[in-house]
């Protein structure tokens, strides 16, 4: 991506999402030791156009605080990196993972931290999850949410509005609503894009603008997400 790079930091997740577009990714080939990241780190060092690194997976927060801290230290030593973005579902499904050590690691880094969580329904944002998200926000971390539009789960104005409000109430910005990626075994979750467009139009009538996520789709070969207008 222009100005950005993505690194698969871990091959495991705390939960198996049936609609995940990386469900068949060869995670067994991913680095298991810190030195195994060195080729990727060297590539980052040599490309001064990259100012933001995305840690993805799997789930980066499946790494221990110690291992994640070692990786962040190496990233901090790359002078042209300015921001660290972590894509994770852990604060939603395993909120105790948001430890004091993790918060200190993120907020004391010279890299500006951004955490993108993944919640699809307000029923996921329960008390423990709310507390974990508030801890991140109050520590000064920018926290965004991305959701997937799923038939029978959140394909109604009420469900999407409730999700946005539950996130906004704890300081998390609804960022993206993804059209389902067509992965094997997930066809029953797919919502017609015209339905998605109507849902977004209704959300705009009901919610303040900042609480309405962008409706987007991943298209193979494109260098960015495509907004569904």
Write out the residue ranges for each language-model feature.
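Hydrophobic positions in the central parallel beta-sheet of the AAA+
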Residues: 7, 53-55
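Short, flexible loop/turn elements at secondary-structure junctions
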Residues: 11-13, 59, 90, 121, ...
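Iron-sulfur (Fe-S) cluster-binding segments and ferredoxin-like electron-carrier domains
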Residues: 20-32
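Surface-exposed cleft-lining segments at the edges of enzyme active sites
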Residues: 27-29, 57-58, 86
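Conserved AdoMet/S-adenosylmethionine-binding subsite of the radical SAM
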Residues: 38-52, 61-207
């Amino acid at each position: 991506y222009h100005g950005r790079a993505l690194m698969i930091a871990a091959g495991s997740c705390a939960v198996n999402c049936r609609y995940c577009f990386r469900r068949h990714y060869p995670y067994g080939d991913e680095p298991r030791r810190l030195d195994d990241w060195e080729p990727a780190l060297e590539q980052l060092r040599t490309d001064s156009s990259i100012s933001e690194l995305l840690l993805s997976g799997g789930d980066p927060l499946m790494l221990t605080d110690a291992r994640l801290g070692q990786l962040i230290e190496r990233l901090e030593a790359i002078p042209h990196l300015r921001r660290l973005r972590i894509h994770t579902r852990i604060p939603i499904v395993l909120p105790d993972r948001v430890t004091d050590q993790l918060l200190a690691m993120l907020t004391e880094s010279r890299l500006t931290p951004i955490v993108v969580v993944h919640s699809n329904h307000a029923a996921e944002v329960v008390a423990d999850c709310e507390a974990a998200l508030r801890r991140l926000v109050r520590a000064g971390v920018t926290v965004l949410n991305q959701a997937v539009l799923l038939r029978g789960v959140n394909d109604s104005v009420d469900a999407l509005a409730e999700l946005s409000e539950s996130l906004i109430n704890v300081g998390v910005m609804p960022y993206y609503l993804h059209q389902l990626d067509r992965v094997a075994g997930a066809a029953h979750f797919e919502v017609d894009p015209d339905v998605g467009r109507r849902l977004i139009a209704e959300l705009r009538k009901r919610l303040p603008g900042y609480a309405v996520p962008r409706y987007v789709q991943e298209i193979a070969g494109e260098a960015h997400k495509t907004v569904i207008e």
